[in-house]
């Protein structure tokens, strides 16, 4: 989340009113206070002080930066959009209450999702006015997977979460011609056919340590219909493996996920301080030495 303030005790309060603390030596902030936790009603949601999506400071210099990348580099221009609806509603309600709403209070669940998405869509619409004609990829992240399962059953996902994701992907296509990159950690194998139907072009981060997220399975079932972005394990391999093991896994991923194209080499998630530098170098140097086995050109 952007904006916010540092509280006297060192915690960070963001523009949504969510308070976080950053543990020593960690690259992540951890949730500490959820402003809409507990017993609330749709009226409480309507009265909540939402961020101002029209604040011009959000967009200052945005077009200039995108234009420079487009005209002066050979990079793809990626816009990191703010459509983290599941995340943000979890942060506002707290995980326990969010799951209770998902299971038993659908009116409240939808009221919060509607309010949050309205703010996010206006933020992004204003951004697209600045850079919608320049971006090659619109990326957004919203975790709907856990280590061993999705956040909810497939029928519940389709009833309560997918309709909002459809509004998001439609919003992106309405304002840009960009490819859509979607980030979700965890075991989301069951949802991938729906992601494809929604028009998502690439899935990140391919958490290979999660259940049913084996690269072979994903490439066999979904290769050619969605691209994969990630796959180098950050839970076990990078922090605990040897440089030789990292290099071997990168080569294997080129053979599996990279076969025929449709894969971007990347670590599954942020590389933490306990990862030996030698392993980071092994990942990048091996990646540079490998070649994608692209699909054969049509005759």
Which residues does each PLM region occupy?
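A contiguous, low-structure linker/loop signature
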Residues: 2-51, 72-75
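Active-site loop segments of alpha/beta catalytic cores
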Residues: 13, 22, 45-299
């Amino acid at each position: 989340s952007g904006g916010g303030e540092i509280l006297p005790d060192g915690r960070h309060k963001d523009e949504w009113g969510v308070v976080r603390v950053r543990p020593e030596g960690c690259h992540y902030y951890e949730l500490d206070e959820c402003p809409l936790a507990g017993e609330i009603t749709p009226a409480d949601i309507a009265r909540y002080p939402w961020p101002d999506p029209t604040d011009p400071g959000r967009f200052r210099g945005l077009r200039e930066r995108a234009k420079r990348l487009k005209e002066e580099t050979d990079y793809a221009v990626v816009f990191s959009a703010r459509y983290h609806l599941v995340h943000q509603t979890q942060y506002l309600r707290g995980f326990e209450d969010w799951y209770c709403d998902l299971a038993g209070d659908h009116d409240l669940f939808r009221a919060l999702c509607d309010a949050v998405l309205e703010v996010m869509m206006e933020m992004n619409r204003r951004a697209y006015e600045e850079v919608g004609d320049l971006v090659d990829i619109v990326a957004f992240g919203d975790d709907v997977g856990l280590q061993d399962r999705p956040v909810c059953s497939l029928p519940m996902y389709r009833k309560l979460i997918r309709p909002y994701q459809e509004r998001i992907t439609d919003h992106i296509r309405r304002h840009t011609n960009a490819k859509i990159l979607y980030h979700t950690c965890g075991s989301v194998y069951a949802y991938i056919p729906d992601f494809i139907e929604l028009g998502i072009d690439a899935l990140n981060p391919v958490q290979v340590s999660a259940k049913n997220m084996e690269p072979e399975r994903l490439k066999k079932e979904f290769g050619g219909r969605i691209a994969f972005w990630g796959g180098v394990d950050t839970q076990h391999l990078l922090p605990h493996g040897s440089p030789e093991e990292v290099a071997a896994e990168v080569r294997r991923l080129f053979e599996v996920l990279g076969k025929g194209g449709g894969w971007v080499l990347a670590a599954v998630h942020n590389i933490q301080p306990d990862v030996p530098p030698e392993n980071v170098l092994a990942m990048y140097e091996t990646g540079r030495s490998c070649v994608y086995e692209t699909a054969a050109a049509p005759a």
